[in-house]
Amino acid sequence: LLNVLEERDVQIRGHKVRLPLDVILVASANPEDYTNRGRLITPLKDRFGSQIRTHYPLDIDTEVAIIEQEADLSVSADLDLTVPAFMTEIVATVTHAARASQHISQRSGVSVRLSIANEEILVANAVRRSLRSGSSRVVPRIVDLEALPASTSGKVEIETLEEGRDGEILASLVSQAVLAVFKDHVPPDTHRGVVDAFEEDLVVDIGEDVTDDAYVRLLKQIPALEAPVHALLIDEEDAESPAMIASACELVLEGLHLAKRLNKDAAAGRAQFRGRG
């Protein structure tokens, strides 16, 4: 191989055979070799004309574009799938949060494969939830993010001195992403009316078994919720559908909780939001 690359010939039983090949050899390598095998030997490395160090996507938009290009989101023909842009952005932001986390090994790296896998598992969980409820409309919601730690754990290396903190660290990454997307898309001046409604002893339950229509009724019950929901769905094609409204409502409620504007009690796949007063 070394001779072919450099001298374009090879020795066969003492006879030199010319191989004037017009080829280009391109090789890729991971940031870290886990087995200490398969490293490029120095003479071979010397034959490469250039060594190019690439990097992960530097911004969320690029990460989202890769997700949309690479993720396999095919579902059964009798299901109607729509993934809100803000949900895909949350998935991409989880990956960026992992790349900045001191609890995640940056030497091992956090590949874009994490974003792709998380998008696919998010949709898979939404499909499961829709089938259980007997609905053919599939729109991922905040409750579907509970599946992400399982798909994330196998693609990152967690560094912590404390045993059993893996789940907590991964859940924290998801929460960071939800809060970041909430702050980016929901104007602060739309929060006040929603928080005021909860201060009047309003309690709202969410969960996998809560139907899309229940969120439409919630929107009528809390008129102030319409402004932040509209801000999230303003660029969505199917903004008026109950499933899209449900997804946006859950992000608003979860975002307000993470911003310390609402209290939340969670247990057994359900959550209850109430005022902090």
List each language-model region with its residue ranges:
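C-terminal engagement/docking regions of AAA+ P-loop ATPases
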Residues: 107, 127-277
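Generic alpha-helix detector with strongest preference for long hydrophobic helices that associate
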Residues: 6, 21, 25, 29, ...
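Conserved AAA+ ATPase small/helical "lid" subdomain
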Residues: 63-139
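Canonical AAA+ ATPase core
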Residues: 3-79, 121-133
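Helical mechanochemical/support elements of P-loop NTPase systems and associated helical scaffolds
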Residues: 21, 33-40, 44, 50, ...
